[in-house]
Amino acid sequence: MFFSRHLFLFFVLAFCFSQVHGVTRYSVDEQENISIYQKSSRAVVNISNIAVNYDFYYRAIPAESGSGTGFLINKSGIIVTNYHVVEGASKLVVTLSNNSQWPGKLVGADPNNDLAIVHIQAPAESYDVLKFSHSNDIVVGQKVLALGNPFGLRQTLTTGIISALGRTIAAKNGRKIEGIIQTDAAINPGNSGGPLLDSEGNVIGINTAI
């Protein structure tokens, strides 16, 4: 009886410990990252830029000339991305997080600020949307999260902080773009056009790999 009581007590303690351990498996910061990723990733898309080349007999040969990222901002299928992601495309193919593919139509562009708007006609239930932050209190040291498709590796999350504000960089057309947010979150080719999120999951910037 003595042995069985202690054995029972051991199992009770072990069970309780496992439950507590399960609750605290992730730090508060990790839980926040996981939550933001799960709420935001369905709004992030891959954009393939298809250019058409011609062979000796002038037969069209479609070929992917590049790819990048975009994100949906409403249930009408409006996507924000970088202009250089879609520049020169004969055809745009948008891949949602559920792997479904949809033709994209360029409906707006601001080359001077490297911004573009793409539209898709996909069922509204097949994606989520992101909201822009209304806060002007963006500060150096603030935590940020970047979502995108670096090197074609879809649905990638990286984290970091705001390293500096008000930077100036040159766009591909040579024009200077001001008011840039610098971050140490890893942003590589393919991330361009993806969202930079604050700790509430709101968009505070659009990623550009330089």
Task: Kindly give the residue locations of the regions a language model identified.
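Bacterial N-terminal signal peptides that target proteins for export
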Residues: M1-F8
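Serine-dependent protease modules
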Residues: H21-I210
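Bacterial N-terminal signal peptides
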Residues: F8-S18
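Intrinsic low-complexity/disordered segments
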Residues: F3, C16-S18, G179
